[in-house]
Amino acid sequence: MSWQTYVDEHLMCEIEGHHLSSAAIVGHDGAVWAQSTAFPQFKPEEMTNIIKDFDEPGFLAPIGLFLGPTKYMVIQGEPGAVIRGKKGSGGITVKKTGQALVIGIYDEPMTPGQCNMVVERLGDYLVKQGL
């Protein structure tokens, strides 16, 4: 299965009639493995800061999580495993695997819990596959 298939069929899938606004799988080096068409263009340092927060939990809390043109307020997550952010009625979930970051961005009517479920389910699967 290609990385694009994981994005198209597993991250952008429909959940209770809703789906993520955009999603991507990005290597720890910041290289995009696959992304949805609406995934924002980001700066290398934005991905570096996300990785740093996994290594140093709480790093992003005072400055926010930036991805492309959007700044997310970092909210509860799982230190070293999941970062969650909020912006208005939407937000972001980032799950770290051994080699990649699984990223999902949502807006209402999708809920934070639905986004977390979609992103973390694929992330957990990739971890079990050694990826």
UniProtKB/Swiss-Prot annotation:
Where does it localize? Answer: Cytoplasm, Cytoskeleton
Q: Which GO terms describe its molecular function?
A: actin monomer binding; proline-rich region binding
* PTM: Phosphorylated by MAP kinases.
Q: What is this protein called?
A: Profilin-6
| Assigned protein family | Belongs to the profilin family.
Specify the species: Zea mays (Maize)
* GO terms under cellular component: cell cortex; cytoskeleton
One of its GO biological process terms is: nuclear migration
Modified-residue entries (Phosphothreonine), positions: T111
Q: Which residue numbers does the motif Involved in PIP2 interaction cover?
A: 81-97
Q: Which residues cross the membrane?
A: none
Query: Which Cys residues form disulphide pairs?
Result: C13-C115
Listed SUPFAM superfamilies: Profilin (actin-binding protein)
- Which PROSITE patterns would you find in this protein's record? PROFILIN
Instruction: Name the principal localization, coarsely classed.
Output: cytoplasm
List other remarks: The variability of the residues taking part of IgE-binding epitopes might be responsible of the difference in cross-reactivity among olive pollen cultivars, and between distantly related pollen species, leading to a variable range of allergy reactions among atopic patients.
Role this protein plays:
Binds to actin and affects the structure of the cytoskeleton. At high concentrations, profilin prevents the polymerization of actin, whereas it enhances it at low concentrations.
